Amino acid sequence: MSDVLSNDLMQKMDAYWRAANYLSVGQIYLQDNPLLEQPLQLEHIKPRLLGHWGTTPGLNLLYVHLNRLITEHDLDMIYIIGPGHGGPGLVANSYLEGSYTERYPAIERNRNGLQRLFRQFSWPHGVPSHVSPETPGSIHEGGELGYSLAHAYGAAFDNPDLIVACIVGDGEAETGALATSWHSNKFLNPARDGAVLPILHLNGFKIANPTVLARISRQELTDLMRGYGYEPIVVEGDEPALVHHALAAALDRALADIQAIQAAARHQGVTARPRWPMIILRTPKGWTGPKQVDGKQVEGTWRAHQVPIADFKDPAHVQLLETWLRSYRPEELFDANGKFRDELAALAPTGHCRMSANPHANGGELLQPLSLPDFRNYAVALSAPGAAKAEATRALGTFLRDVMRDNLETKNFRLFGPDETASNRLDGVLEVTDKQWMADIEDVDIALGPDGRVMEVLSEHLCQGWLEGYLLTGRHGLFSCYEAFIHIIDSMFNQHAKWLKACDAIPWRRPIASLNYLLTSHVWRQDHNGFSHQDPGFIDHVVNKKASVVRVYLPPDANCLLSVADHCLRSRNYVNLIVAGKQPEWQWLDIDAAVRHCTAGAGIWHWASNDDGDPDVVMACAGDVPTVETLAAVMLLREYVPDIRIRVVNVVDLMVLQPSSEHPHGLDDRRFDELFTVDKPVVFAFHGYPWLIHRLTYRRRNHFNIHVRGYKEEGSTTTPFDMVVLNDLDRYRLALDAIRRIPRLAGQVESATDRYWATMQRHKLYIGEHGDDMPEIRDWRWQA
């Protein structure tokens, strides 16, 4: 048996664990009689029982042991819970530490506070059942499983003094995101970063099935962890005293290994990738709960997952619950007033050393603004609209290079992407930093190193999870990805947006840096990769979330992209989605005009318009390729109908299309009508799926006259122009749409339609013969 714990300390830690377990069960079951000062009655029990018991005792056990480690070694540590359905445990521990009452003074540290604590859990207008933003010390709700370890590593990057204890549920370990997250240790630099201590909580069962990792041999499991690059330390048992001693010894060993790895790297330099420790904790699911209910085994089975005892119409169940609660001996844990006994409370760390009060778990408290160069200095010089071509993301890459350079000292900015930084033309950043890499490096490798700040791994899950963990602990970042494949993290985006929305209502949660997406290699320039790479639907997905959280930008050129990116990097508590092309495209606005345009969100391009306030048609566009096609259509219309009056409206901030009552960026009705008129036809060329524009504008006065072209799920490996043709977004179709909708041109519709189909036939014959677009497309340029 380990001599890490004296018998007295072990007894006190066991009592602390009992207290956390008691509070956890009380939250799930009780609405009254919190100290069992009366015999338990049916009216003391909640009418609806919600919560998850099975994982909770293991989480509570680990919490008290980590507290011992923090106190004895003066550690800076946070606690990430993969199985976040163990929410009552984390609420219980933050209450025992006092931080819960500090955040919520009504939840006093006495009998009344206990009753409120119990009653509010999973109660209408109370607190959620998981480790939600309302829980002090949480940066990871753990409702949707799979992201704990990625968040933990994200939190550890650039936090050299921080240790992140990450509890990985054995059910969670079956998810794809978690399975690849073990590889994060190939990106953690012990000289510069903090440490992650993964603890695999092997309690054996999910909701109704065994877990895979619990049903393979110990040798196979430890070999798996060693294959991932960890040194596993196994703790197992179902006798509390033995487990207390074994777990204390395991944690001491793990800490010693972490400190030795860091000391070697920080004094001798990084010479090789270390083998970091991890712990496998095998204890029964629902440990310390009822052994059996109605003759069926509960503890150590899947039946312990949620609410082990239900149906309290049976008086025997009330008695069984009381026996369970009294097994924790609450009279030994709380005084007559319901206060946690001082000799037990003294086991917890104090102040910011408490995991539930650590400022890293409320990252806005630590957030420092980025040092940003003046983005105007990176502008594409332009003598007139359409006078030059440029790669928008390459211009952005030069700007990001200097953002990276100017924040090297503060170490609070990283760029994330799934092996696409160079492909997306952002490789300018590699002039000032490497791609982070702790695995082997060969002669053919370029810009890999242990001190890099560009995070590339071919897992969108890891990129997203790392970035979220980095942001939630008070830093800044940007995630660059191919547009079609960002859908891989649709659900992760959901969870982060929900987190931000919840935080808006929690006064003590300080704002964090926004999560910034740059989607490029987009649908209209994936002609070379084909249909699988063509999907602009992430825009729709983002727009579903709360208007207080989401922003969507479609800059039409490089200078607008620079303005938008600067704005997004300065923003707080949003998810900013930027969609921009990487291929050479015509540039439209000089930097001053771009700033004005982006500030407005949408505007009339007077240099492309000739309506004198009374247009025949409004040609609207959002997105770089739709903008090109719209302007080309304008030229065609002027050729076809010399006296036509056209207004060109470009939208860069998609959310301005909504009314101001629906989104803070929304245009009021008067301003919207000034742009789009109240009664004239609007032909809207949109980057994404066309129905989104209808959805955003359906309450507008002129909605009936808005006709939208966009992606309609047609694509292949073809030419760039054929992509827009396949989806009826090409200039010829847009021009025909305008003619069909202008009443005074009704007599030209038939001839215009014939001309359109003749052009389409010529286009198809040409690309079939030459494998490239027609010269009039390739060589087109704007002429006023």
Swiss-Prot record:
Keywords tagged on the record: Lyase, Thiamine pyrophosphate
EC number: 4.1.2.-
Domain of life (superkingdom): Bacteria
Record has Lyase as a keyword: yes
Gene Ontology molecular functions: aldehyde-lyase activity
InterPro entries for the chain: Phosphoketolase (IPR023962), THDP-binding (IPR029061), Transketo_C/PFOR_II (IPR009014), Xul5P/Fru6P_PKetolase (IPR005593), Xul5P/Fru6P_PKetolase_C (IPR018969), Xul5P/Fru6P_PKetolase_CS (IPR019790), Xul5P/Fru6P_PKetolase_N (IPR018970), Xul5P/Fru6P_PKetolase_ThDP_BS (IPR019789)
Cofactor: thiamine diphosphate
Listed GO biological process terms: carbohydrate metabolic process
Entry's family note: Belongs to the XFP family.
This protein's name: Probable phosphoketolase
